Amino acid sequence: TAVTTGSGLVTLAVPSSLNSAMEAKTTEVMTVPLSDRNGRISAGAIDEILKRVDKADTVLIGPGLGRCDDVSEVVESVLEYSKVPVIIDADGINAVAENMKALSSCTCPVIFTPHTVEMSRLTGLEREYIEDNRLVTAKEFAEENGVTLILKGHHTIVTGQDGEQYINITGNSGLATGGSGDVLAGTVASLVSRGINETVASAMAVYIHGLAGDIAKDKYGIESVTASKVMECIP
């Protein structure tokens, strides 16, 4: 998605055991094989990852990582080291939720992209409370932690660390499909890498993602919307 939305160069860090398959599948991006354990990136890859972070304009971490101690160590190391914006999605969110202190040593701009369940893990709040108090919950989390927050759901809410909020009007229930969040995360990373303010870039990405979902719904029918079709329909 980052390539589709304008990134000139995208590098995908993958477990070495999966590198050949990913090279064959992703023709538009470069892959970097990393030391792994049981098919997941291991803590032994941290030095190589940080070298790559030095060369990046933006880092997206989380999609497909899985949940284990090594992954948590990788995520925490990237947060502590990075000087460029870091987008934390999927299993990256789970890793931070297990150790919120990881944010205290972080000096780079951070963007979280949780859905309600992930937001519950981050905050310790009940899902029902979050769903009934989305604006307040998002604002408090963003301000208290000094981050940008994309709280996904019906009318996704984007909140900046200063409390500024945007409510998105695009999108439909067809976007609640596997991989759709990864499409959004890649779009956020692409726009942030251009130097656009993190909150504005996040709001733009959410709007584009929702609009692509609406185009896909009109083209294929809501029951047939998939992540790949959403990416295909990005205007």
Predicted regions and their residues:
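Small-residue (G/A/S/T)-rich helix-start motifs and N-terminal tracts that mark the onset
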Residues: 1-87, 94-111, 116-235
